[in-house]
Protein backbone atom coordinates (compact mmCIF):
# COMPACT_ATOMS: atom_id res chain seq x y z
CA UNK A 1 0.00 0.00 0.00
CA UNK A 2 1.33 3.46 -0.92
CA UNK A 3 2.55 5.65 1.92
CA UNK A 4 0.97 9.01 2.76
CA UNK A 5 3.74 11.51 1.95
CA UNK A 6 4.35 14.84 3.67
CA UNK A 7 5.93 17.46 1.40
CA UNK A 8 7.68 20.75 2.05
CA UNK A 9 7.30 22.83 -1.12
CA UNK A 10 9.58 25.87 -1.23
CA UNK A 11 8.64 28.58 -3.74
CA UNK A 12 12.04 30.25 -3.79
CA UNK A 13 11.92 34.06 -3.46
CA UNK A 14 8.12 34.33 -3.03
CA UNK A 15 6.92 36.61 -0.20
CA UNK A 16 3.92 38.60 1.01
CA UNK A 17 3.74 42.31 0.22
CA UNK A 18 0.67 44.56 0.29
CA UNK A 19 1.48 46.88 -2.60
CA UNK A 20 0.79 45.56 -6.10
CA UNK A 21 3.39 47.85 -7.69
CA UNK A 22 6.26 45.79 -9.11
CA UNK A 23 4.83 42.79 -7.24
CA UNK A 24 4.87 39.70 -9.48
CA UNK A 25 3.40 37.56 -6.70
CA UNK A 26 0.28 39.77 -6.52
CA UNK A 27 -0.04 40.30 -10.27
CA UNK A 28 0.42 36.67 -11.39
CA UNK A 29 -2.62 34.52 -12.21
CA UNK A 30 -2.10 31.63 -9.76
CA UNK A 31 -5.41 29.77 -9.31
CA UNK A 32 -3.84 26.76 -7.58
CA UNK A 33 -1.97 28.71 -4.92
CA UNK A 34 -5.06 30.87 -4.35
CA UNK A 35 -7.30 27.79 -4.06
CA UNK A 36 -5.09 26.21 -1.39
CA UNK A 37 -4.74 29.57 0.33
CA UNK A 38 -8.50 30.01 0.70
CA UNK A 39 -9.24 26.37 1.59
CA UNK A 40 -6.52 25.50 4.13
CA UNK A 41 -4.99 27.06 7.28
CA UNK A 42 -2.44 29.80 6.52
CA UNK A 43 -0.01 32.07 8.32
CA UNK A 44 3.12 34.07 7.49
CA UNK A 45 6.60 33.75 8.96
CA UNK A 46 9.79 35.82 9.09
CA UNK A 47 12.66 34.92 6.75
CA UNK A 48 15.20 37.70 7.33
CA UNK A 49 17.29 39.45 9.98
CA UNK A 50 17.53 38.17 13.54
CA UNK A 51 14.89 35.50 12.87
CA UNK A 52 17.35 33.63 10.64
CA UNK A 53 20.56 34.48 12.50
CA UNK A 54 21.47 37.55 10.42
CA UNK A 55 21.90 41.12 11.69
CA UNK A 56 18.69 43.07 12.23
CA UNK A 57 17.11 44.25 8.98
CA UNK A 58 19.37 42.17 6.72
CA UNK A 59 17.54 40.39 3.90
CA UNK A 60 17.55 36.62 3.90
CA UNK A 61 18.96 34.45 1.14
CA UNK A 62 18.59 30.88 -0.09
CA UNK A 63 21.62 29.46 1.73
CA UNK A 64 20.63 30.95 5.08
CA UNK A 65 16.96 30.16 4.50
CA UNK A 66 17.42 26.48 3.73
CA UNK A 67 19.87 26.06 6.60
CA UNK A 68 17.35 27.51 9.06
CA UNK A 69 14.50 25.47 7.58
CA UNK A 70 16.44 22.20 7.78
CA UNK A 71 17.88 22.85 11.24
CA UNK A 72 14.52 23.73 12.77
CA UNK A 73 16.13 26.49 14.81
CA UNK A 74 17.82 29.88 14.35
CA UNK A 75 21.25 29.24 12.82
CA UNK A 76 23.55 32.12 13.71
CA UNK A 77 25.55 33.18 10.65
CA UNK A 78 29.24 34.08 11.06
CA UNK A 79 28.66 37.85 11.15
CA UNK A 80 25.98 37.61 13.84
CA UNK A 81 27.90 35.00 15.79
CA UNK A 82 31.02 37.19 15.93
CA UNK A 83 28.99 40.32 16.78
CA UNK A 84 27.31 38.38 19.59
CA UNK A 85 30.63 37.14 20.97
CA UNK A 86 31.99 40.72 21.02
CA UNK A 87 28.84 42.01 22.76
CA UNK A 88 28.93 39.14 25.32
CA UNK A 89 32.65 39.64 25.99
CA UNK A 90 33.45 36.03 24.99
CA UNK A 91 35.53 37.40 22.11
CA UNK A 92 38.13 38.76 24.53
CA UNK A 93 38.45 35.38 26.27
CA UNK A 94 38.85 33.45 22.98
CA UNK A 95 41.71 30.94 23.28
CA UNK A 96 43.07 31.39 19.76
CA UNK A 97 43.12 35.20 20.03
CA UNK A 98 44.82 35.00 23.40
CA UNK A 99 47.34 32.48 22.04
CA UNK A 100 48.23 35.02 19.34
CA UNK A 101 48.80 37.66 22.03
CA UNK A 102 50.91 35.23 24.07
CA UNK A 103 53.01 34.37 20.98
CA UNK A 104 53.72 38.07 20.40
CA UNK A 105 54.69 38.58 24.04
CA UNK A 106 56.96 35.52 24.11
CA UNK A 107 58.75 36.55 20.91
CA UNK A 108 58.74 40.30 21.65
CA UNK A 109 57.29 40.63 18.15
CA UNK A 110 54.46 42.32 16.25
CA UNK A 111 50.80 41.53 15.66
CA UNK A 112 49.61 42.01 12.06
CA UNK A 113 45.89 42.26 11.36
CA UNK A 114 44.57 41.60 7.83
CA UNK A 115 41.06 42.16 6.53
CA UNK A 116 38.53 43.91 4.35
CA UNK A 117 37.98 47.39 5.80
CA UNK A 118 34.25 48.04 5.36
CA UNK A 119 30.85 47.46 6.91
CA UNK A 120 29.59 45.49 3.90
CA UNK A 121 29.06 42.48 6.15
CA UNK A 122 29.58 40.04 3.28
CA UNK A 123 33.24 39.12 3.83
CA UNK A 124 34.03 41.03 7.01
CA UNK A 125 33.04 43.92 9.23
CA UNK A 126 35.43 46.64 10.34
CA UNK A 127 33.91 46.64 13.83
CA UNK A 128 35.63 43.26 14.24
CA UNK A 129 38.96 44.99 13.58
CA UNK A 130 38.06 47.51 16.30
CA UNK A 131 37.41 44.62 18.72
CA UNK A 132 40.86 43.21 17.90
CA UNK A 133 42.40 46.62 18.62
CA UNK A 134 40.52 46.70 21.96
CA UNK A 135 41.95 43.25 22.75
CA UNK A 136 45.48 44.42 21.88
CA UNK A 137 45.01 47.44 24.16
CA UNK A 138 43.72 45.25 27.04
CA UNK A 139 46.70 42.93 26.71
CA UNK A 140 49.25 45.73 26.50
CA UNK A 141 50.52 45.08 22.96
CA UNK A 142 52.35 48.03 21.40
CA UNK A 143 53.33 46.80 17.92
CA UNK A 144 50.03 46.29 16.06
CA UNK A 145 50.03 46.77 12.28
CA UNK A 146 46.89 46.81 10.15
CA UNK A 147 47.03 45.64 6.53
CA UNK A 148 43.73 46.90 5.17
CA UNK A 149 42.01 45.68 2.02
CA UNK A 150 39.67 48.19 0.42
CA UNK A 151 36.19 47.13 -0.65
CA UNK A 152 34.24 49.20 -3.20
CA UNK A 153 32.01 46.24 -4.14
CA UNK A 154 29.78 45.49 -1.17
CA UNK A 155 29.83 49.21 -0.30
CA UNK A 156 30.17 52.40 -2.37
CA UNK A 157 33.03 52.41 -4.87
CA UNK A 158 34.78 55.32 -3.16
CA UNK A 159 34.00 54.95 0.53
CA UNK A 160 37.43 53.88 1.82
CA UNK A 161 38.42 57.24 3.31
CA UNK A 162 35.47 57.12 5.71
CA UNK A 163 36.61 53.73 7.08
CA UNK A 164 40.24 54.83 7.17
CA UNK A 165 39.38 57.98 9.15
CA UNK A 166 37.27 56.01 11.64
CA UNK A 167 40.04 53.43 12.06
CA UNK A 168 42.66 56.13 12.61
CA UNK A 169 40.41 57.71 15.23
CA UNK A 170 40.28 54.28 16.92
CA UNK A 171 44.10 53.98 16.82
CA UNK A 172 44.28 57.38 18.50
CA UNK A 173 41.65 56.79 21.19
CA UNK A 174 43.12 53.40 22.17
CA UNK A 175 46.75 54.41 21.71
CA UNK A 176 47.45 51.25 19.73
CA UNK A 177 47.64 50.32 16.04
CA UNK A 178 48.71 51.92 12.77
CA UNK A 179 48.21 51.24 9.06
CA UNK A 180 51.09 49.28 7.52
CA UNK A 181 49.82 48.56 4.02
CA UNK A 182 46.72 49.14 1.90
CA UNK A 183 45.54 47.03 -1.04
CA UNK A 184 42.41 46.98 -3.16
CA UNK A 185 40.50 43.70 -2.78
CA UNK A 186 41.18 43.05 -6.49
CA UNK A 187 44.75 42.24 -5.43
CA UNK A 188 44.58 40.93 -1.87
CA UNK A 189 41.33 38.97 -2.20
CA UNK A 190 41.64 37.26 -5.57
CA UNK A 191 40.22 33.72 -5.65
CA UNK A 192 41.15 32.57 -9.17
CA UNK A 193 44.89 31.96 -8.74
CA UNK A 194 45.84 35.19 -10.46
CA UNK A 195 49.14 35.14 -8.63
CA UNK A 196 50.44 38.33 -10.28
CA UNK A 197 47.75 40.24 -8.37
CA UNK A 198 48.23 38.41 -5.09
CA UNK A 199 52.00 38.88 -5.31
CA UNK A 200 51.65 42.68 -5.32
CA UNK A 201 49.59 42.56 -2.12
CA UNK A 202 51.96 39.99 -0.57
CA UNK A 203 55.02 42.13 -1.32
CA UNK A 204 53.46 45.14 0.40
CA UNK A 205 52.38 43.08 3.43
CA UNK A 206 55.28 40.65 3.89
CA UNK A 207 58.26 42.51 2.44
CA UNK A 208 57.11 46.11 2.98
CA UNK A 209 57.73 46.81 -0.72
CA UNK A 210 55.75 49.00 -3.08
CA UNK A 211 54.83 52.66 -3.52
CA UNK A 212 55.22 54.43 -0.15
CA UNK A 213 53.01 57.19 1.25
CA UNK A 214 53.09 59.20 4.45
CA UNK A 215 49.51 58.18 5.28
CA UNK A 216 46.80 55.78 4.15
CA UNK A 217 44.67 58.76 3.09
CA UNK A 218 47.44 60.17 0.89
CA UNK A 219 47.91 56.80 -0.86
CA UNK A 220 44.20 56.34 -1.52
CA UNK A 221 43.85 59.89 -2.87
CA UNK A 222 46.79 59.28 -5.23
CA UNK A 223 44.97 56.20 -6.57
CA UNK A 224 41.74 58.18 -6.94
CA UNK A 225 43.70 60.74 -8.98
CA UNK A 226 44.57 57.86 -11.34
CA UNK A 227 40.85 57.04 -11.73
CA UNK A 228 41.06 53.90 -9.58
CA UNK A 229 38.21 53.07 -7.20
CA UNK A 230 38.67 51.32 -3.83
CA UNK A 231 38.53 47.77 -5.19
CA UNK A 232 41.41 48.47 -7.60
CA UNK A 233 43.73 50.54 -5.37
CA UNK A 234 47.28 49.34 -6.10
CA UNK A 235 48.98 47.86 -3.03
CA UNK A 236 51.06 50.47 -1.21
CA UNK A 237 52.89 50.81 2.08
CA UNK A 238 52.37 53.42 4.77
CA UNK A 239 55.50 54.88 6.30
CA UNK A 240 55.72 54.20 10.04
CA UNK A 241 57.15 51.73 12.55
CA UNK A 242 56.32 48.62 10.52
CA UNK A 243 58.94 46.90 8.37
CA UNK A 244 57.00 43.90 7.04
CA UNK A 245 56.25 40.54 8.59
CA UNK A 246 59.22 39.06 10.41
CA UNK A 247 60.12 35.76 12.07
CA UNK A 248 58.14 35.25 15.27
CA UNK A 249 55.31 37.65 14.35
CA UNK A 250 51.59 36.82 14.56
CA UNK A 251 48.81 37.38 12.02
CA UNK A 252 45.04 37.54 12.59
CA UNK A 253 42.91 37.61 9.41
CA UNK A 254 39.45 38.90 10.33
CA UNK A 255 37.54 38.06 7.12
CA UNK A 256 34.90 35.47 8.03
CA UNK A 257 33.91 34.45 4.49
CA UNK A 258 36.52 31.97 3.26
CA UNK A 259 36.47 32.12 -0.54
CA UNK A 260 38.38 35.38 -0.98
CA UNK A 261 40.62 35.06 2.06
CA UNK A 262 41.98 31.57 1.43
CA UNK A 263 44.47 32.36 -1.33
CA UNK A 264 46.51 34.98 0.54
CA UNK A 265 46.50 32.76 3.63
CA UNK A 266 47.81 29.86 1.57
CA UNK A 267 50.80 31.96 0.47
CA UNK A 268 51.74 32.45 4.14
CA UNK A 269 50.89 29.01 5.55
CA UNK A 270 51.22 26.33 2.85
CA UNK A 271 54.85 25.19 2.72
CA UNK A 272 54.22 23.59 -0.69
CA UNK A 273 52.99 26.89 -2.18
CA UNK A 274 54.50 27.48 -5.64
CA UNK A 275 52.37 30.24 -7.21
CA UNK A 276 55.31 32.64 -6.95
CA UNK A 277 58.59 32.78 -5.04
CA UNK A 278 58.12 33.35 -1.32
CA UNK A 279 60.39 33.24 1.67
CA UNK A 280 58.52 31.48 4.47
CA UNK A 281 58.25 33.41 7.74
CA UNK A 282 59.73 31.29 10.53
CA UNK A 283 57.72 30.72 13.70
CA UNK A 284 54.71 32.65 12.37
CA UNK A 285 51.47 32.36 14.36
CA UNK A 286 48.63 32.64 11.82
CA UNK A 287 44.97 32.74 12.84
CA UNK A 288 41.85 33.17 10.71
CA UNK A 289 38.35 34.04 11.93
CA UNK A 290 36.85 30.93 10.27
CA UNK A 291 38.28 27.83 8.57
CA UNK A 292 39.18 28.89 5.04
CA UNK A 293 40.03 25.56 3.37
CA UNK A 294 42.21 22.46 3.68
CA UNK A 295 45.21 24.09 1.93
CA UNK A 296 45.35 26.75 4.61
CA UNK A 297 47.01 25.63 7.83
CA UNK A 298 45.87 28.12 10.47
CA UNK A 299 44.49 28.45 13.95
CA UNK A 300 40.72 29.07 13.70
CA UNK A 301 39.08 31.66 15.97
CA UNK A 302 35.45 30.62 15.34
CA UNK A 303 35.19 26.92 14.57
CA UNK A 304 32.25 25.76 12.44
CA UNK A 305 29.23 24.79 14.54
CA UNK A 306 28.11 21.30 13.55
CA UNK A 307 24.35 21.12 13.15
CA UNK A 308 22.95 17.85 14.45
CA UNK A 309 19.39 16.60 14.27
CA UNK A 310 18.45 18.45 11.10
CA UNK A 311 15.21 17.36 9.42
CA UNK A 312 17.09 14.80 7.29
CA UNK A 313 18.85 13.21 10.25
CA UNK A 314 15.63 12.99 12.27
CA UNK A 315 13.92 11.35 9.27
CA UNK A 316 16.79 8.84 9.02
CA UNK A 317 16.65 8.07 12.76
CA UNK A 318 12.94 7.30 12.38
CA UNK A 319 13.46 5.03 9.33
CA UNK A 320 11.61 7.41 7.01
CA UNK A 321 12.18 7.49 3.26
CA UNK A 322 12.91 11.01 2.02
CA UNK A 323 13.36 12.70 -1.35
CA UNK A 324 15.22 15.95 -2.11
CA UNK A 325 14.38 17.40 -5.51
CA UNK A 326 15.19 20.66 -7.35
CA UNK A 327 16.73 21.97 -10.54
CA UNK A 328 20.45 22.80 -10.67
CA UNK A 329 20.14 26.38 -9.37
CA UNK A 330 18.62 25.27 -6.06
CA UNK A 331 19.87 21.70 -5.78
CA UNK A 332 22.63 22.53 -3.24
CA UNK A 333 19.99 24.25 -1.14
CA UNK A 334 17.65 21.25 -0.78
CA UNK A 335 20.65 18.96 -0.15
CA UNK A 336 23.79 20.50 1.40
CA UNK A 337 22.22 23.53 3.10
CA UNK A 338 19.01 21.75 4.14
CA UNK A 339 21.24 19.12 5.80
CA UNK A 340 23.18 21.73 7.79
CA UNK A 341 26.29 21.74 5.59
CA UNK A 342 26.45 18.01 4.90
CA UNK A 343 27.01 16.62 1.40
CA UNK A 344 26.35 12.93 2.05
CA UNK A 345 22.87 11.49 1.76
CA UNK A 346 21.20 10.18 4.90
CA UNK A 347 20.08 6.57 5.01
CA UNK A 348 16.74 6.32 3.24
CA UNK A 349 17.34 9.57 1.33
CA UNK A 350 17.33 9.83 -2.44
CA UNK A 351 17.87 12.86 -4.63
CA UNK A 352 16.69 14.07 -8.02
CA UNK A 353 18.66 16.79 -9.80
CA UNK A 354 16.97 18.30 -12.85
CA UNK A 355 19.24 20.37 -15.11
CA UNK A 356 18.48 24.09 -15.25
CA UNK A 357 18.11 25.41 -18.82
CA UNK A 358 21.25 26.69 -20.54
CA UNK A 359 20.21 30.29 -21.22
CA UNK A 360 22.12 33.54 -20.69
CA UNK A 361 19.52 34.86 -18.24
CA UNK A 362 16.37 33.21 -16.94
CA UNK A 363 14.02 35.99 -18.05
CA UNK A 364 14.50 34.38 -21.51
CA UNK A 365 12.94 31.15 -20.19
CA UNK A 366 10.86 32.03 -17.12
CA UNK A 367 9.47 28.51 -16.73
CA UNK A 368 13.09 27.28 -16.30
CA UNK A 369 12.84 23.52 -15.58
CA UNK A 370 9.73 23.66 -13.39
CA UNK A 371 7.73 21.28 -15.60
CA UNK A 372 10.57 18.74 -15.63
CA UNK A 373 10.90 18.98 -11.83
CA UNK A 374 7.15 18.42 -11.52
CA UNK A 375 7.23 15.40 -13.85
CA UNK A 376 10.15 13.86 -11.97
CA UNK A 377 8.34 14.32 -8.66
CA UNK A 378 5.12 12.74 -9.94
CA UNK A 379 7.23 9.79 -11.09
CA UNK A 380 8.76 9.48 -7.61
CA UNK A 381 5.34 9.72 -5.94
CA UNK A 382 4.10 6.84 -8.10
CA UNK A 383 6.64 4.58 -6.39
CA UNK A 384 4.52 4.97 -3.24
CA UNK A 385 7.44 4.63 -0.79
CA UNK A 386 8.07 8.23 0.31
CA UNK A 387 7.41 9.66 3.77
CA UNK A 388 9.04 13.08 3.34
CA UNK A 389 9.62 15.24 0.27
CA UNK A 390 11.62 18.46 0.14
CA UNK A 391 11.03 20.28 -3.15
CA UNK A 392 12.21 23.66 -4.40
CA UNK A 393 10.85 25.65 -7.35
CA UNK A 394 13.63 28.11 -8.27
CA UNK A 395 11.71 30.37 -10.66
CA UNK A 396 10.36 33.25 -8.52
CA UNK A 397 13.87 33.91 -7.20
CA UNK A 398 16.02 33.29 -10.27
CA UNK A 399 13.74 35.20 -12.66
CA UNK A 400 13.05 37.83 -9.97
CA UNK A 401 16.77 38.65 -9.99
CA UNK A 402 16.32 40.01 -13.52
CA UNK A 403 14.31 42.92 -12.12
CA UNK A 404 11.84 42.38 -14.98
CA UNK A 405 8.16 42.23 -14.06
CA UNK A 406 6.60 40.35 -17.00
CA UNK A 407 9.04 37.40 -17.04
CA UNK A 408 8.74 37.10 -13.24
CA UNK A 409 4.94 36.96 -13.51
CA UNK A 410 5.32 34.21 -16.14
CA UNK A 411 7.73 32.37 -13.84
CA UNK A 412 5.19 32.33 -11.01
CA UNK A 413 2.38 31.25 -13.34
CA UNK A 414 4.46 28.29 -14.56
CA UNK A 415 5.23 27.28 -10.97
CA UNK A 416 1.54 27.56 -10.04
CA UNK A 417 0.61 25.11 -12.80
CA UNK A 418 3.15 22.62 -11.46
CA UNK A 419 2.11 23.25 -7.86
CA UNK A 420 -1.46 22.26 -8.68
CA UNK A 421 -0.49 18.89 -10.12
CA UNK A 422 1.95 18.09 -7.32
CA UNK A 423 -0.25 19.08 -4.38
CA UNK A 424 -3.39 17.46 -5.80
CA UNK A 425 -1.46 14.21 -6.25
CA UNK A 426 -0.20 14.36 -2.64
CA UNK A 427 -3.74 15.03 -1.38
CA UNK A 428 -5.03 12.08 -3.44
CA UNK A 429 -2.52 9.91 -1.55
CA UNK A 430 -3.93 11.25 1.78
CA UNK A 431 -0.68 13.12 2.34
CA UNK A 432 0.00 16.70 3.44
CA UNK A 433 1.88 19.63 1.92
CA UNK A 434 3.41 22.73 3.47
CA UNK A 435 3.66 25.44 0.79
CA UNK A 436 6.06 28.22 1.75
CA UNK A 437 9.22 30.15 0.72
CA UNK A 438 12.76 30.83 1.93
CA UNK A 439 12.91 34.62 1.44
CA UNK A 440 11.38 37.42 -0.63
CA UNK A 441 12.32 38.63 -4.12
CA UNK A 442 9.55 38.33 -6.73
CA UNK A 443 7.24 40.31 -4.44
CA UNK A 444 9.18 43.43 -5.51
CA UNK A 445 11.06 43.48 -8.81
CA UNK A 446 10.59 47.21 -9.48
CA UNK A 447 11.42 50.18 -7.28
CA UNK A 448 8.81 52.86 -6.60
CA UNK A 449 10.09 54.78 -9.63
CA UNK A 450 9.97 51.69 -11.89
CA UNK A 451 13.68 50.90 -11.88
CA UNK A 452 14.63 47.19 -11.86
CA UNK A 453 15.04 45.88 -8.31
CA UNK A 454 17.19 42.77 -8.40
CA UNK A 455 17.75 42.17 -4.67
CA UNK A 456 15.89 40.07 -2.15
CA UNK A 457 13.29 41.64 0.16
CA UNK A 458 12.78 41.35 3.92
CA UNK A 459 9.05 40.63 3.60
CA UNK A 460 7.50 37.69 5.49
CA UNK A 461 6.73 34.52 3.54
CA UNK A 462 3.40 32.69 3.34
CA UNK A 463 2.73 29.26 4.83
CA UNK A 464 -0.14 27.00 3.77
CA UNK A 465 -0.62 23.68 5.59
CA UNK A 466 -3.00 21.44 3.65
CA UNK A 467 -4.59 19.87 6.73
CA UNK A 468 -8.14 20.89 7.50
CA UNK A 469 -9.29 21.44 11.06
CA UNK A 470 -5.99 22.72 12.49
CA UNK A 471 -5.14 26.29 13.52
CA UNK A 472 -1.76 27.87 12.81
CA UNK A 473 0.14 30.30 15.03
CA UNK A 474 -0.07 33.91 13.83
CA UNK A 475 3.69 34.37 13.51
CA UNK A 476 6.83 32.32 13.33
CA UNK A 477 10.11 32.00 11.47
CA UNK A 478 11.76 29.63 9.00
CA UNK A 479 13.16 27.57 11.88
CA UNK A 480 9.58 26.54 12.75
CA UNK A 481 9.02 24.65 9.47
CA UNK A 482 10.94 21.45 10.36
CA UNK A 483 9.05 21.09 13.67
CA UNK A 484 5.80 21.54 11.70
CA UNK A 485 6.84 18.77 9.29
CA UNK A 486 7.63 16.46 12.22
CA UNK A 487 4.24 17.33 13.73
CA UNK A 488 2.50 16.25 10.49
CA UNK A 489 4.64 13.08 10.38
CA UNK A 490 3.84 12.28 14.05
CA UNK A 491 7.55 12.16 14.82
CA UNK A 492 8.99 13.50 18.09
CA UNK A 493 11.04 16.70 17.94
CA UNK A 494 14.64 16.44 19.26
CA UNK A 495 15.64 18.92 21.97
CA UNK A 496 18.30 20.70 19.87
CA UNK A 497 15.63 21.55 17.29
CA UNK A 498 14.40 24.60 19.20
CA UNK A 499 11.83 25.88 16.68
CA UNK A 500 8.13 25.34 17.39
CA UNK A 501 5.48 23.71 15.24
CA UNK A 502 3.26 26.30 13.57
CA UNK A 503 0.25 24.09 14.36
CA UNK A 504 -1.48 25.13 17.58
CA UNK A 505 -2.19 22.30 20.03
Curated annotation (Swiss-Prot):
GO terms for molecular function: manganese ion binding; phosphoglycerate mutase activity. Pathway: Carbohydrate degradation; glycolysis; pyruvate from D-glyceraldehyde 3-phosphate: step 3/5. The keyword tRNA-binding does not apply. One of its GO terms (cellular component) is cytosol. Binds 2 manganese ions per subunit. Its cofactor is Mn(2+). The active site is at residue 62. One of its GO terms (biological process) is glycolytic process. Mn(2+) 1 binds at residues 397, 401, 456. Its EC number is 5.4.2.12. It catalyses: (2R)-2-phosphoglycerate = (2R)-3-phosphoglycerate. It holds the Pfam family Metalloenzyme. Signal peptide: none annotated. InterPro entries: Alkaline_phosphatase_core_sf, BPG-indep_PGM_N, Metalloenzyme, PGAM_B_sf, Pgm_bpd_ind. Keywords: Glycolysis, Isomerase, Manganese, Metal-binding. SUPFAM superfamilies: 2,3-Bisphosphoglycerate-independent phosphoglycerate mutase, substrate-binding domain, Alkaline phosphatase-like. Mn(2+) 2 binds at residues 12, 62, 438-439. Belongs to the BPG-independent phosphoglycerate mutase family. Catalyzes the interconversion of 2-phosphoglycerate and 3-phosphoglycerate. Monomer. This is 2,3-bisphosphoglycerate-independent phosphoglycerate mutase. It comes from Staphylococcus haemolyticus (strain JCSC1435). The lineage of its organism: Bacteria, Bacillati, Bacillota, Bacilli, Bacillales. The gene is gpmI.
